[in-house]
Amino acid sequence: MLDAAAKLFVDPGYAATPLTAVAAEAGVAVQTVYAVFGNKRQLLSDLVDVTLVGDDEQVAMAERSFVADIRALTGLRAKLTRYARHLAETHARQVHVMLALAGAASADADAAAIWRKNLEDRRRGMAMFAADLAASGEVLVSQERAADVLWLAQDVRNYDWLVRERGWPVERFERWFVDSVAAVLGAPD
């Protein structure tokens, strides 16, 4: 059902897709969609969560293996490089859904609430990452500014613009992320 929702929420779009269409695409009764998700908003929320992490495991983001990998590394660039690889993998998986969500947020209150929650969750995650990076001793800006820079740089729309629109190889996107963030974090406020 999530695959069907992902397909239809991207095209023709969230607002244009009734749950009956999701059910038909998934080959299930609409009652099944309601039984599993309750409503369209919850279906969208679950879809965003699953595309973000790549599975439906109930594991907090801070407990995911890539976070342990980053924490085990030393040095600003090493940590950013590992995060950039995770970021590119995540964006490749979620770009279509997240762009559809961003578009739907301008016209639909439920989508707007989910988009806002996603932005806030990402900002909290980047605040935790900024604190970890500060421990390297190489960050010369405030943790608040570091979190803001990380939050902006990791936005899915950057991946869309550079990789999908401009045709950058993923490796170049990863280098751009590391170089851009390291340059700002390593320069005094």
Question: Each predicted region: which residue ranges?
Answer:
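Helix-turn-helix
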Residues: 4, 8-42, 46
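Solvent-exposed, amphipathic alpha-helical segments
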Residues: 4-12, 65-69, 97, 149, ...
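Flexible coil/turn residues that form the inter-helical turn or adjacent wing/linker of helix-turn-helix
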Residues: 15-16, 155, 166
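Conserved catalytic core of Hanks-type protein kinase domains
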Residues: 36, 90, 152-153
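Hydrophobic alpha-helical connector segments
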Residues: 40-42, 46, 57-92, 147
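Amphipathic alpha-helical packing segments from all-alpha helical-bundle domains
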Residues: 85-102, 109-137, 144-148, 175, ...
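Short helix-capping/turn signature of helix-turn-helix
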Residues: 103-108, 153-156
